[in-house]
């Protein structure tokens, strides 16, 4: 028996790391899409929280986007990757917990 395909919840929220230059392109308006590794089964309506990292460390800056368009099966996309389109974003600042090892 074939297994039914399980879609993620439409209101799912995922956190991903992002570099400073990527977040700058988003907030300045020059980028409205992302090419990403499919770490989760994203779908339209999901929220991505992009956490800015500089030299491997979180800066506390985040950008929230809601997926408006998405494809992972187009001819030019590597297996395991997807293109995500979004219309708007929200910028926020969050506290960073400094872990002392």
List each model region and its residues.
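Catalytic phosphate/metal-binding cores of nucleic-acid and nucleotide-processing enzymes, i.e., regions
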Residues: 10-93
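Short intrinsically disordered terminal tails
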Residues: 3-9, 88-101
């Amino acid at each position: 028996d074939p297994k039914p395909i399980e879609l993620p919840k439409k209101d799912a929220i995922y956190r991903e790391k992002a570099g400073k230059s990527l977040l700058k392109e988003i907030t300045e308006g020059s980028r409205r899409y992302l090419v990403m590794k499919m770490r989760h089964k994203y779908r339209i309506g999901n929220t991505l929280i992009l956490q800015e990292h500089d030299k491997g460390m979180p800066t506390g800056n985040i950008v929230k986007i809601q997926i408006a368009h998405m494809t992972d099966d187009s001819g030019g996309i590597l297996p395991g990757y997807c293109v995500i389109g979004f219309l708007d974003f929200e910028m926020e600042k969050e506290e960073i917990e400094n872990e002392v090892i």
